[in-house]
């Protein structure tokens, strides 16, 4: 969030991102960040973790373990269900999506989203995609 982009710039970048399927310098810059490296390392610890997306306070992607299908997450339920600029927040402290096919991960996933705070201020969200076919069953 240190580098705030205007809404117009976010939308322009999102449009280019979708059109070029994430093959652009901005996606490379995000993927090569230290935070993206940490997300990638965490996701590699379990085979059922498929994706991790860290957003800023406008829903823009600021870190990821793999290139996402779009840059702006701000219009998606994983962001809108939990992000709140009001203090105290009146939204849930987590969100679990319905299972769905995900083109980025090529798997049937559920997304678990939580808010990210800096002190008392909600500064973004973290979403983790979980491959439901790989989650260990407690009876096996």
Predicted regions and their residues:
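Residue-level detector of beta-strand face positions
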Residues: 53, 98-100, 115
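Short N-terminal helix-loop-first-beta-strand/juxtamembrane motif that initiates sensory/input modules
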Residues: 1-7, 41-60
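Short loop/turn motifs at secondary-structure junctions and domain boundaries
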Residues: 42-47, 90, 102-108
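Extracytoplasmic/periplasmic sensor domains and loops in membrane signaling proteins
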Residues: 21-39, 66-100
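Solvent-exposed loop/turn segments at secondary-structure junctions
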Residues: 58-61, 68-71, 102-105, 130-132
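Conserved beta-strands of PAS-like sensory domains
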Residues: 64-65, 107-139
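Extracellular/periplasmic ligand-binding regions of membrane signal-transduction receptors
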Residues: 1-34, 60
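Short coil/loop residues immediately preceding or within conserved phosphate-binding loops
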Residues: 49, 94, 111
């Amino acid at each position: 969030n240190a580098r705030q982009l205007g809404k117009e710039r976010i939308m322009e970048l999102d449009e280019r991102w979708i059109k070029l399927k994430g093959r652009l310098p901005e996606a490379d810059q995000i993927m090569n960040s230290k935070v993206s490296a940490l997300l990638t390392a965490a996701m590699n610890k379990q085979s059922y973790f498929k994706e991790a997306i860290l957003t800023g306070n406008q829903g823009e992607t600021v870190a990821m373990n793999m290139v996402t299908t779009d840059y702006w997450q701000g219009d998606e339920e994983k962001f809108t269900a939990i992000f709140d600029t009001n203090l105290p927040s009146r939204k849930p402290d987590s969100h679990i999506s319905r299972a769905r096919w995900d083109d980025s991960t090529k798997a049937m996933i559920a997304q678990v989203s939580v808010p990210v705070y800096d002190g008392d201020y909600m500064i973004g969200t973290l979403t983790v995609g979980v491959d439901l076919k790989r989650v260990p069953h407690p009876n096996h």
